[in-house]
Swiss-Prot record:
PROSITE patterns per the UniProt record, alphabetical: POLYPRENYL_SYNTHASE_2
Positions with a binding annotation for Mg(2+) 2: 150, 154
Magnesium is among the record's keywords: yes
Family matches, as Pfam families: polyprenyl_synt (PF00348)
Annotated TM spans: none
Gene: esdpD
Positions of Mg(2+) 3 binding: 274
The species this protein was found in: Penicillium shearii
Official protein name in the record: Geranylgeranyl pyrophosphate synthase esdpD
């Protein structure tokens, strides 16, 4: 084998050495800013590798960041779509109203709003859009005609007058986006810097899913709950995000006032009002579809009262079993519910609950011109 003599340092390409002044080395933190000794061959080779690695690493990092941003846009698309739909943002207003008392820093309040907002949108995607999808038990793969949409759980085809997310992005992508939102919300909690925040988050999500589980069980098993069972379920499910928000606010505040009983009451008012509007409001029908609780087969507050008042109300139970989309059948169903005095009973229940909430506000020393008083006024049924 022919042995080549080692190449002397002065025979190496001089341009390579001239390319990097001591200033260049210093800027890249490869050596001190001034030196009286020129780089040795070993130093030159080391720097060359360092520069190549740095450039490659920087480029790869930028590429990875761009890829992550693109993936985030794709994964979050159903969330962003639903979040862009017009709405009253009652939860955000409620959080701001409670902070009139607790006065936590605005940056902390915004974190709590983001957490609750993400969980709310996730619940709309997953609880309402996905879990309300019905499949024929004899089929292993559902066809398009078998999707019942209220977002997937409620059977509705509209949300705020526009198509539900899973009709645009598909069921699988919508499920994934909802789960992604749960973990994004959880990651936001770490910015609060309070270990107890994660305990509160976990406790309330467990309660929320327990409530939702019972709601689905009654619907899918065609079991009509008692009024007391329904109110307990609502306190767990609908009250969950309200309770999460107020507990996180209280965690950040020096104010020791306990507002959880008030929040629980507001959650019940909110849900019963929604049940009533679903079957009685023209605007609700325009935004979400006519009589969607009937199509879903849901045991809502007025429906439960009607069934219990009429000794099981076999007609109403049979209609719920059918999960009908026929508007004439749904109009007849509403007549049945009206005939048992169930809408009037629901109105009176809301009046009673609202009076209790006002009394609680007064006992807490809340001004009637406050944000919370305004929210209660908004929740009152307008005849």
């Amino acid at each position: 084998m022919i042995q080549l003599p080692p190449t002397p340092l002065h025979d190496l390409n001089p341009a390579f050495h001239q390319e990097f002044s001591s200033m260049s080395w210093s800027a890249l933190h490869a050596m001190p800013s001034t030196t009286s000794v020129g780089p040795s061959l070993k130093e030159v080779n080391t720097f060359s590798q360092h520069k190549s690695h740095s450039i490659f690493h920087h480029g790869a990092e930028i590429e990875q960041q761009n890829k992550f941003r693109q993936e985030k846009v794709i994964i979050s698309a159903p969330l962003d779509y639903l979040g862009s739909l017009p709405g009253k943002d009652i939860r955000g207003k409620l959080i701001s109203a409670f902070n009139e008392w607790f006065k936590i820093p605005e940056e902390k309040l915004e974190v709590i709003k983001r957490v609750v907002g993400l969980l709310h949108v996730a619940s709309l995607l997953y609880v309402h859009e996905i879990q309300h999808t019905h499949f024929e038990p004899s089929l292993t793969k559902p066809s398009k005609s078998l999707y019942r949409i209220d977002d997937i759980q409620d059977s509705s085809k509209l949300r705020r007058g526009l198509p539900v997310a899973h009709n645009i992005f598909g069921v699988a992508q919508t499920i994934n986006s909802a789960n992604y939102a749960y973990f994004r919300a959880q990651s936001e909690l770490f910015t609060l810097g309070k270990p107890q925040a994660l305990d509160i988050f976990t406790e309330e999500l467990l309660r929320l899913h327990r409530g939702q589980g019972m709601d689905l069980y009654w619907r899918d098993s065609l079991i009509c709950p008692t009024e007391e069972e329904y109110l307990e379920m609502v306190a767990n499910k609908t009250g969950g995000l309200f309770r999460l928000a107020i507990k996180l606010i209280q965690l950040e505040s020096e104010n020791t006032m306990d507002c959880v009983p008030l929040v629980d009451l507001l959650g019940v008012i909110f849900q019963i009002r929604d049940d009533y509007q679903n079957l009685q409001s023209d605007q609700y029908a325009k935004n979400k579809g006519f009589g969607e609780d009937i199509t879903e087969g849901k045991f809502s507050y007025p429906i439960i009262h009607s069934i219990r008042k009429d000794n099981g109300n076999s007609q109403l139970m049979n209609i719920l079993r059918q999960k009908t989309e026929d508007e004439d059948v749904k109009r007849y169903t509403i007549q049945i519910i009206e005939s048992t005095g169930s809408f009037e009973y629901t109105r009176q229940k809301l009046i009673s609950l609202t009076a209790q909430a006002r009394a609680l506000l007064k006992s807490l020393g809340v001004d009637q011109s406050s944000g919370l008083a305004s929210i209660l006024e908004f929740l009152e049924l307008k005849q």
